[in-house]
Amino acid sequence: MLWLGFIALGVAIIIAAIIWVLLYKEYKKIKLQEKIEQIRQKIRDRTEDRGKESDGDAEWLAILLSPDKLDNWV
């Protein structure tokens, strides 16, 4: 009967690990989206101030939105 308890404990640990991995992936996704939104806002602010877009921030945004980054979200 003791071995049944160990099996149940092992299954519970595996399920908990899977849940934490999924939560971590969602957390990273949300943080990346926040970073993208901050860069977009910075570009908008600079555009309003100067009347032109900042190339450095636009380039950084393009890197963040590259297809290889989007593949990691799925």
Swiss-Prot record:
It is a single-pass type I membrane protein. Residues 1-4 are extracellular. It comes from the Viruses. The modification Phosphoserine is found at S54. GO terms for molecular function: CD4 receptor binding; monoatomic cation channel activity. Phosphorylated by host CK2. This phosphorylation is necessary for interaction with human BTRC and degradation of CD4. The keyword Transport applies. Its main location: host cell. HIV-1 lineages are divided in three main groups, M (for Major), O (for Outlier), and N (for New, or Non-M, Non-O). The vast majority of strains found worldwide belong to the group M. Group O seems to be endemic to and largely confined to Cameroon and neighboring countries in West Central Africa, where these viruses represent a small minority of HIV-1 strains. The group N is represented by a limited number of isolates from Cameroonian persons. The group M is further subdivided in 9 clades or subtypes (A to D, F to H, J and K). This is Protein Vpu. It comes from Human immunodeficiency virus type 1 group N (isolate YBF106) (HIV-1). The gene is vpu.
